[in-house]
Design a protein with these regions (language model features):
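Conserved acidic, small-residue-rich alpha-beta core segments centered on
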Residues: 125-260, 265
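Flexible, low-complexity junctional segments that flank or bridge functional domains
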Residues: 1-146, 153-160, 174, 201, ...
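A recurrent domain-boundary module in secreted/ectodomain proteins
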Residues: 262-274
Length: 274
């Protein structure tokens, strides 16, 4: 009612867009947005209100310039014989051959770091494909509910989400996943899967975004997107507001000034047995 009172016949397109954008903002959902030819109404508070805990400058110091790239993943062996993979997005699907080559190359290392910091998501199938390399048996990784009617609580019963092991090369050593508040949507799901695969999560709480988005077009041509299918962890707790790390670490000012990524260094210590 509060917003309907603000809509009058004399509103310009910009003014109407602002009113509707503010109304959608009440949901505080990063998957909810509205787009027009001139703007995108969005809620990015899930990452903008928190420390970044990630730096491209620091990342370049670890990857250097001779890192390998395969299937959109950047990887190398660090100088302490720890494998490192940076996964910036799940917008594209890495090929099974790509993942075979990466894991084969990193097989001699003593452990593996998968860095998904600031990965805002993409394809759930891409997240599942990568996670399937880290389990030797089918496991329960969470639950999902589907919208089945117009009512506020018209959702299905909990439906199991299960992860099957890849039929290709699988990792058998320790693995750490690095997170920050920029981890969202499919990347948030990846962290949920990897926790059930036995990985240690290090960094900051993820941004969340545990709802499959649905898009539609408004009569005036603007498009609107909203969450339709809520998702939960194995304890049937919503991960919409993020997943807490096993070891909470942030990049310190001192380390940043020295060119050190505090979160990567903590993962290296763990994998080295310290």
């Amino acid at each position: 009612v509060r917003y309907s009172r603000q809509v009058t016949d004399g509103l310009s397109a910009d003014q109407l867009f602002e009113v509707m954008g503010n109304m959608l903002g009440e949901l505080r959902d990063g998957h909810v947005n509205m787009s027009s030819s001139f703007d995108l109404a969005r809620n990015w508070s899930w990452k903008e209100d928190y420390p970044t805990n990630f730096s491209d400058t620091l990342l370049r110091r670890y990857l250097s310039t001779d890192y390998r790239v395969s299937g959109g993943l950047r990887y190398r062996m660090l100088d302490d014989n720890i494998g490192y993979i940076y996964c910036p997005t799940f917008e594209s699907m890495p090929g099974e051959g790509n993942l075979d080559e990466i894991l084969y190359y990193l097989a001699p290392t003593n452990g593996l770091i998968i860095d998904v910091r600031s990965n805002s998501g993409g394809l759930l199938t891409a997240a599942e494909r990568l996670a399937s390399r880290f389990t030797d048996s089918e496991i329960l990784v969470g639950y999902m509910r589907h919208k089945r009617g117009p009512g506020h609580n018209d959702f299905s019963d909990m439906q199991e989400q299960r992860l099957s092991p890849s039929t290709h090369l699988r990792w058998q050593k320790r693995v750490v996943v690095l997170t920050n508040r920029g981890v969202y949507s499919a990347a948030n799901e990846f962290v949920k899967y990897m926790r059930e695969c036995g990985a240690t999560i290090i960094g900051d709480k993820t941004g969340g975004g545990a709802g499959l988005p649905f898009s539609s077009e408004l009569p005036n041509g603007w498009s609107v997107r909203f969450s339709a299918c809520p998702m939960y962890d194995t304890r049937q707790q919503s991960t919409e507001d993020g997943i807490e790390p096993d070891i909470a670490v942030g990049i310190t000012d001192d380390d940043f000034a020295r060119g050190r990524d505090t979160i990567i260094e903590r993962a290296r210590q763990l994998l080295a047995g310290h």
